[in-house]
Each structure stands twice: as C-alpha cells, then as structure tokens.
A protein has these predicted regions:
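Conserved short histidine dyad/triad with adjacent acidic residue
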Residues: 56-75, 88
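A short beta-strand-loop-beta hairpin characteristic of the jelly-roll/cupin
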Residues: 80-102
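Conserved metal-binding segment of the jelly-roll/cupin
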Residues: 1-2, 100-120, 129-131
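Conserved hydrophobic/aromatic beta-strand scaffold that supports enzyme active sites
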Residues: 60-62, 80, 97, 105-107, ...
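A short, N-terminal "cap"/entry segment at the start of jelly-roll beta-barrel domains
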Residues: 3-65
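A generic "binding-loop/recognition-motif" signal
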Residues: 76, 87, 96, 112-113, ...
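Extended, charge-rich intrinsically disordered regulatory tails
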Residues: 134-138
C-alpha cells in the first residue's frame, strides 16, 4: 500500500537504507508464547522485523511434524503465508480448516483466530508477510 504519515515519520526516524532485510540463513530466531509446543521441531525467523519498514514485517517458519502452532490472533496485523517447497500443513482460520502445500497462499485478516497442525509426515515451510494496515495500536 501507499506510505501514510506513520510510515514517512518512521522512515525518517530510522535513517536507514532500503531494503532492510536479511537472508533466510541470517534471519533472527524467535519463539512466541503460542508456539512453545513447536520450539523443538520448528524454527521461526524474522527476515525484516516489525516497524522498521513502516507497517510491514516478514519472516519464515520451517520444521518437521508432528507439531501444532497454537491458535492466536494479531490485533494489528493482516497476514499472508506463502507455502514454500516441501511445506504441507492444515491451516485453520476463523474456525475453517484447509490443507495447504507448496505454492498455496493464505490470507488472514487482523483479529482472526488462526493456527496450524503439521502431521508426522509433513514439514512446515512458509514465508510470511504482515502489514499493520491501520498502523500499530501501541
């Protein structure tokens, strides 16, 4: 989307050269509270961290099943998953489940409960993009 006043002010404050991102191999690892059950089998990475490119952030999740990504919401973020080669899982959003695999793209609007299940013979491998469409609440 177009840059709004928040984006312009943030870019001016950061004083960075674009693009500000990292290669997958150099990405920052993180674990979220709802993902504690997958910490040993799946890895979550930030490729471009929140708030540094205005309202956008990007990352990558990879690992093996069986596993579960607990149901959670993002109050400020719309989110897209792009399923990468070898990736396969059951994705649930707002109570509806669908099986996704390589080449599929999901969209989840802000405040929508969502999570995933990865079967024993599946792998999680997806790139995510998030955007705080209306800016961040805090």
């Amino acid at each position: 989307g177009e840059m709004d006043q928040h984006d312009i002010e943030r870019m001016d404050y950061i004083h960075m050269e674009l693009p500000r991102f990292r290669l997958f191999k150099d990405a920052w690892r993180y674990v979220e509270g709802f993902n504690t059950s997958i910490a040993s089998t799946c890895q979550s990475h930030h490729v471009m961290e929140h708030r540094f490119l205005g309202r956008y952030s990007m990352g990558w999740n990879v690992g093996a099943g069986p596993s579960v990504i607990g149901t959670h919401i993002h109050p400020d973020l719309d989110q897209w998953y792009i399923i990468l080669p070898g990736g396969s899982m059951t994705y649930t959003a707002d109570g509806e489940s669908t099986h996704v695999s390589e080449g599929d793209v999901t969209y989840t609007g802000m405040n929508t409960p969502h999570g995933s299940e990865i079967a024993a013979d599946e792998k999680i491998n997806y790139f995510w993009v998030e955007c705080a469409i209306n800016g961040y609440a805090s």
